[in-house]
């Protein structure tokens, strides 16, 4: 080892207080490959301020009756899509999804805009009081998602802790059902998923399956009973109840 190596490894730090910053050449020396990997550019996390999972828990503790919607993305091919922006209305277990060709923060913000246009501003603010999502870069446009096109606040966005998808576990569980139709690793377009209409069909079948925790009712039935105005808006968009005997949770559902 050279003297430089010993100084960089900290051998002389205790004896003489010499560090690598005391080396004249160190300022201009290129970082070794291993060290370069350690000093990664810090990610801008300003959007998390006031929106952490702890902030979320505090807010719902103070406002226990608010409607929470969990949000995520589902996809198989990260480079070519398609990308599904999923929403779960927690109170009834209803799953909704929007089809995208891109997984960008602009696309996800546009997805929230579309959901608002489907429900209308008043119902959106009633039923999407909170959006809880993960820290994926596609969801980093917090302020844009929180505001309607007219600039007024429409919802509050909060983020799960890193590597804690279980904090929105009810949505993850719903993804399991969706994956019966859209298996991981499959070419989703080859399966027949080529647009919003195809996605609506898949979502309709998932939401029409009876759920034991709902007393054998489906999420669509429960939504119709408890929040008919929400049900009607989604019905008009193409999310429709399928007879229980005709529910298909298999990949061949979308075959033309």
Task: Identify the residue ranges that each predicted region occupies.
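Secondary-structure boundary/capping micro-motif
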Residues: 1-192, 196-204, 208-211, 219-256
